[in-house]
Amino acid sequence: MIYTWVNKVIRQNIRKRVEEIFAFSEAPIETQEQLLRGLISKAQNTTYGQLHHFEHISDREIFSKLVPLSSYATLKPYIEKMRDGQTDILWPGKIEWFAKSSGTTSGVSKYLPVSKESIEECHFSGGRFELALYCNAVPETKIFEGLGLRLGGSTQIQQEGKGQSGDLSAILIQNIPLWAELRSAPSHETALLSDWEEKLEAIIDEAITQNITSLWGVSSWFLVLFKKVLERTGKSNLLEVWPNLELFAHGGVNFAPYEQQFRELMPGTQVTFMENYNASEGFFAVQDDPSIDGMLLLLNNGIYYEFIPLDTFNGTASKTLLLEDVELDTDYAIVITTNGGLWRYILGDTVKFVSKKPFRVKVSGRTEHFINAFGEEVIVTDAEYALQATCEAMECRVIDFHAAPCYMNNETTGAHQWLIEFEQAPADLEAFKIALDLNLQSQNSDYQAKRKYDLVLELPRIIAAERGLFHQWLKEKGKLGGQNKVPRLSNNRSLIEQFLALNASLQTQP
C-alpha cells in the first residue's frame, strides 16, 4: 500500500516538474529575473545584504554594480562566522550543513554553506527535474516498479564548529525525503557506512538481489562497483544482473573516456544514459534529450547565472554577461548566485552553450588547468604544492612537469601519469612517487578519497623526462620566451601523448 502511495506522489510531482520546465524554457530571462528578485528579497537583512545595499537592488544591472564578484577566498570570512554558529550572515537563519570540497588555493578543503532551501529547492529539485525529463521522454517507463541505486562519496559527517560538514552526498542522504528513500537502494544504514570498502561490499550484498531500474552517481565510482558485481555474480553484463535496468544518470566527471566501457557493461539500447551537471555549490543542468550533447540549464532551481568570456577572464575583476548575451561555442566561466548564500560566486567551471532556445550547455573545463577524470578535482596549485614538498624532502629539483590521467580499463585502475623533467633527480624514484602521492593526498581531500584502497586511483606513474624536453616542445610550438609556459595539468591525454612522443625521439638522439 505504501509503495502505491509513493508512486502516486512521484508521478504527480513529475507532471508538475514537466510543466515548470516548459514554462522556464519559454520565458528564460523573465524566470531568472524573478528568481534573482526572490533571492535579494530573502537575504536583504543579512550581514552581506546590508553591506551591499540589497534594499536598493531592483534589477540585474544594479545587482552587478552593487555586489562584487566573489571567490571562496573572499567569502571565507563570512563562511567562518556561519561555521561558528552566527546567524543571518550570507543567508537568513543558521546554516547547519557545510559541504566539504577540495579545490581551493587557500587550504586543504573549502566549506560551502548548504541551506535548507538549497537542499530542497536546488539539489533535490535538480534530481526531480532529471527524473521528470526522463519520464516525459519515456512515457512507458517502468522505473518506479523498481529501485534507484545511488552511489555517493564518503558519508562521514563531522561536527566542526557549530555546524556539520562532510561530502555533499552524505548531507543529502541525511536529509532525503521519505518518498525518495523508499524507492532507493542501498538501505539508509548501508549508505551511511563510513568505510568505503565495507560499504561497497554491503551495497553489492543488497543490490544483486533487488530489482534495480535506475543508477545515480559518478561514473568512475560506478565502474568500480560494476566490476565487483560481475565478479560476485559471474554474469557477463549488468543486464543479466538487473534485467529491468533502464536509466543511468551520471555526472561529476567527464564521461567520454568511460562511455564505451559502460556500453559494453549495459549492451543494446535498453538503458538510457542521461548526464547531469551538479556540484557541492548546486544542481545546474540536466540532459533533456539523450541525442543532444548538451544539458538543459535549470533556470528556476535556486540559482541565478552570469557568465564571463574565458578569453577575458580576470578573476573577481572580470566583466560578466547576462544570459541573453551569451554566444554559442564560446567558453564561459560560470558565476552563480544561490539560495545557499553564494553571491556572484565564480564557480571555477567553464561551459559552452550548444543552443539558446532552450539554453543548453556542456562543461568544457575549468578556469585553471586541472585533472578531474575521477572526481579528484586536482588543480595546478595542488600539484605544485605536492611536488615542491616532495622535492624539499628528497633533496631534488624539478625544471618542469606535466600530469594527465590514465583511464580505467578492464585490466587496470585509473592513475595520474606525471612526466617530470628534473634538474637534480631523486636518488630513489619509487620513494619519490610514494612521497608525492602522500603530499597530494594531504593537500586535496577529494584526491585522498579516490586513492583509498586503490579502488579508483592507484599510485601515480612517474616518468623522468629527457633534459630539454619542455624547452624543445615550446620551441617547436613557437612559444619560447614571454609569458609562454608548459601547461602543467590536463584532463585528457592529448597533450601528454605529444610530450611522450617527443621524449621518445629525444631518447634516440646521441
Predicted regions and their residues:
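Active-site glycine/GP-rich loop and adjacent strand/helix microenvironment
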Residues: 1-55, 63, 67, 78-85, ...
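Conserved helicase ATPase motor motifs in RecA-like P-loop NTPase domains
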Residues: 99-105
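Short "domain-exit" segments at the C-terminal end of structured domains
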Residues: 107-117
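Short, basic alpha-helical nucleic acid-contact segments in DNA-binding proteins
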Residues: 126-131, 291
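Conserved AMP-binding loop of ANL adenylate-forming enzymes
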Residues: 132-177
